[in-house]
């Protein structure tokens, strides 16, 4: 309790000093690379990053240890190449994003308390009843619920709440939970991109690139861009339509990628399930559920009062521990994924060390240089495409939180130097950072949290298994976002709202067509979302290939 309480007040002080913005560490070390060794430091940083990924992909060591080794190697390299004295432990800890760590710790404590009430088992039975036992219908329900919750909470919190439910549900239905969990976390990143509070990169962008924040920039040229800053409502209006366009293609990709595991019907006796998996502690559920509801309401009010979400989560955890069972806290704390928290700490130290070594800044410089090489007429579309895809690929392989923190000042300076409109570039960065997080297991915080909880339950998610599903979904959704940005901000620059309406109508029309096509084949509306359209396309491509090869042989 003391640890959590002191942590809460520490986060309060840090958050208030930073103006309540969340999602990034405001302390920045003054580190300068020795003259003449900049290129060498850059190369060493890149090699360290590749080595860490090699360890994670091949699973030579556990990913937490891989991140710790990478962070240690990066700090040693930074000590060697920097002009300053060796980094102290205090200096190294400033590289850790304590806002993220605090949010995760507080939410894990609350989820641990809730799990003892039996509410997750009850929710699993209710989801089964709604699906009628059809596995694909259940998958669609879980994905859509995840996307909506992620938009209005945040994707990390959503996955902390839904992962135990999904695992319990899979056990009840004798399913392997990993495909369900991967599908959910992919949609948590997609849904979280729709609002300012849904994904950590959006929180950072909304805080740093608001009109008020830009107007306080000491550089007059940058402060002049304040009118182009973005607000909470702007995220919904500008990001929302593209995210809606990604829903059906995303579901079709999930259906195709897991067509064998997420199909069929599981028949269970509902009465027996309700008897076996009922609420075990109604009083505890009322207390902890009420506290969680207040925490969620406080999350909603974050854009208004600017109270750090880490503070809200930590205080909620302390209050819930005190209110439910103040004499027994060991059991709830067993549910805290300490290895996940250590993984994040190592990853933040690694990536911020690479930033000081110049690797991430070099990426930003190359992006700006590439955009500046285009003609004036082509500069805006080129900037949108390059920022979007570089952000997506980089966020897949470098956690999107430190990447976004690095790119925010790069984007602001680039728009001022090249006289580009700021808003389209902001949305390109947000789409790329959020959707790119689906690319790999460590691309987004929600991915890592889900993998940690799944491993604790006995279902480890490998890097390669996640990559096989996540990377294709990332490519498809990023492509959709690119088309949306080009049509709305380049082709339809004079009337962007009209183009948003047209794209939404086309999306609705395609959805109706998909429903009618599926229902004419005897499918339910939800089953229609997973109609085998992709299978038909692939089969047609194979037939075309065979035809061509047959002609050549003749």
Describe the residue ranges of each PLM region:
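Hydrophobic alpha-helical transmembrane segments
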Residues: 46, 68-69, 101-102, 136-144, ...
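Hydrophobic alpha-helical transmembrane segments in multi-pass integral membrane proteins
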Residues: 195, 200, 294-300, 347-365, ...
């Amino acid at each position: 309790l003391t640890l959590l309480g002191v942590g809460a007040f520490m986060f309060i002080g840090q958050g208030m000093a930073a103006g309540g913005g969340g999602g990034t560490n405001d302390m920045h070390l003054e580190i300068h690379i020795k003259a003449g060794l900049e290129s060498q430091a850059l190369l060493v940083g890149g090699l360290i990053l590749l080595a860490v990924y090699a360890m994670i992909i091949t699973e030579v060591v556990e990913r937490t240890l891989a991140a710790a080794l990478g962070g240690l190697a990066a700090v040693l390299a930074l000590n060697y190449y920097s002009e300053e004295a060796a980094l102290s432990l205090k200096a190294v800890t400033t590289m850790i994003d304590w806002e993220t760590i605090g949010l995760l710790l507080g939410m894990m404590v609350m989820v641990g308390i809730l799990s003892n009430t039996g509410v997750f088992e009850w929710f699993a039975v209710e989801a089964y009843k709604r699906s009628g036992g059809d596995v694909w219908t259940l998958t669609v329900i879980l994905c859509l619920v995840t996307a909506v919750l992620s938009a209005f909470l945040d994707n990390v919190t959503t996955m902390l709440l839904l992962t135990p439910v999904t695992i319990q549900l899979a056990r009840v239905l004798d399913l392997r939970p990993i495909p369900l969990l991967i599908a959910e976390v992919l949609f948590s990143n997609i849904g979280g991109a729709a609002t300012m509070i849904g994904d950590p990169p959006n929180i950072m962008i909304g805080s740093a690139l608001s009109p008020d924040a830009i107007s306080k920039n000491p550089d007059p040229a940058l402060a002049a861009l304040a009118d182009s800053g973005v607000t909470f409502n702007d995220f919904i209006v500008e990001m929302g339509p593209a995210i809606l366009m990604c829903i059906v293609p995303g579901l079709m990709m999930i259906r195709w990628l897991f067509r064998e595991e997420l199909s069929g019907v599981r028949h269970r006796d509902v009465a027996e399930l309700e008897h076996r998996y009922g609420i075990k502690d109604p009083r505890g559920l009322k207390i902890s559920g009420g506290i969680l509801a207040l925490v969620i309401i406080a999350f909603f009010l974050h854009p208004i009062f600017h109270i750090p979400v880490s503070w809200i989560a930590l205080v909620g955890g302390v209050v819930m521990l005190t209110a439910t069972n103040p004499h027994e806290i060991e059991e709830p704390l067993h549910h805290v994924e300490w290895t996940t928290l250590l993984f994040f700490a190592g990853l933040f130290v690694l990536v911020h060390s690479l930033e000081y070594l110049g690797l991430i800044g070099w990426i930003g410089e190359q992006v700006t240089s590439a955009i500046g090489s285009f003609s004036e007429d082509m500069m805006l579309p080129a900037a949108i495409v390059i920022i979007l895809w570089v952000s997506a690929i980089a966020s897949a392989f470098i956690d999107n939180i430190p990447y976004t923190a690095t790119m925010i000042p790069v984007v602001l300076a680039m728009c001022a130097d090249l006289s580009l409109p700021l808003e389209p570039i902001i949305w390109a960065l947000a789409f790329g950072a959020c959707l790119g997080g689906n690319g790999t297991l460590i691309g987004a915080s929600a991915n890592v949290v889900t993998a940690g909880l799944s491993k604790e339950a006995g279902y480890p998610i490998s890097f390669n298994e996640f990559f096989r599903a996540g990377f294709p979904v990332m490519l498809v959704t990023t492509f959709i976002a690119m088309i949306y940005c080009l049509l709305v901000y380049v082709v339809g620059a004079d009337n962007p709202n009209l183009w948003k309406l047209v794209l939404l109508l086309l999306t609705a029309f395609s959805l109706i067509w998909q429903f009618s096509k599926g229902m004419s084949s005897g499918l339910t509306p939800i089953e229609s979302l997973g109609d085998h359209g992709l299978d038909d396309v692939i089969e047609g491509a194979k037939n075309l290939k065979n035809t061509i090869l047959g002609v050549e042989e003749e």
